[in-house]
Amino acid sequence: PDTLPEDPCYVAVLTNIMEHPADVIDFSNQKVVTNAAREILLISRSPIPYPKGTRDFEYEKVTGIQLYSKQALAFYHATPKSILEKAEENDMMRFIENGHKVHAIVSPYKTVSVDTPKDLALVNTILKEKQHG
């Protein structure tokens, strides 16, 4: 967004559009579903939304880059982990389950999360290609 919303407990995450079908079923990728205002409705490691009625949508994943207002950090510190946060291992669920909006901002730049040895190998390959390419 161009300006920060009125909510003093402001949280936003950077996302990327997923380009490869295999990434959608990879549990290390946290997928998001948003409403028309780009507020996150759900974050899951499962493929969401499930393509039962249509495949006319893009899967979006969390990059790991997050923005918190001072009030959001205070809320996070003072509030225990939520049920879905524990299940999905995603701290954004703490805000969502407690009624705070989390905004998703799609980045035009592709990012790589480094959460597994496979991710690290991919980053090393990318860096080698940049050095020699």
Q: What feature does the model see in each segment?
A:
Residues 57-133:
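Conserved alpha/beta core of the MobA/IspD/sugar-nucleotide pyrophosphorylase nucleotidyltransferase superfamily
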Residues 1-80:
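Conserved core of the sugar-phosphate nucleotidyltransferase
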